[in-house]
Amino acid sequence: MGYFDYSREPKSDIAFVDMKSFYASVECVKRGLHPLKTSLCVMSRADNSTGLILASSPMFKKIFGKSNVGRAYDLPFDIKTRKFSYYNARKQGLPTDSDYVRYIEDWAQVTLVVPPRMDEYIAVNMEIQRIFQNYGSPDDIYPYSIDEGFIDLTSSLNYFIPDKSLSRKDKLDLLSARIQRDIWRQTGIYSTVGMSNANPLLGKLALDNEAKHTPTMRANWSYQDVEE
């Protein structure tokens, strides 16, 4: 494989920020509940067995093995009675022993199923955008979706982290941690950050492939991390 000279490539300091389970987290915070420890899903037509799951908390995903998109009838419990659904379990190849049934029913009883409130999500998103503007100019902030976007911190990195003994990679990590902290303090929402001292694409790849699985919820992919 030929050698690629990345020193000729443009470089920027990128923080690609994703709000963890955004809709579900907003609903948890509005109820004074911990967004990572509460079993909650946002469902259209929440009183109906055909309701569409629009978002779910990390705990909901862990317990019921469901992603953000699905139907109420795919759950291992009946949405109305909160009783174990043997039919759904067998259809999906899930266990039906008494311990598993009790486990699912116990969690089903405390699981919150709530309707979507887009006005709330937009309001929290605007609050997060204002936090971003504390660290970069509007021209350096690029919304990707309602719960995700990146900030080009190239021009502001040394201003916020002036320590000359630190590398730009270390500075980017410190500043990204500060952004995470501010989002959590002001909104109660946890965020994940894919960082790159190269370009937004590598920041996005770091976010999707590594940051979501690290204790700090941050990861950095730059040119030196790309195979030649």
Whereabouts are the PLM-identified features?
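Gly/Gly-Pro- and Ser/Thr-rich, intrinsically disordered tail segments characteristic of DNA damage-repair
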Residues: 1-228
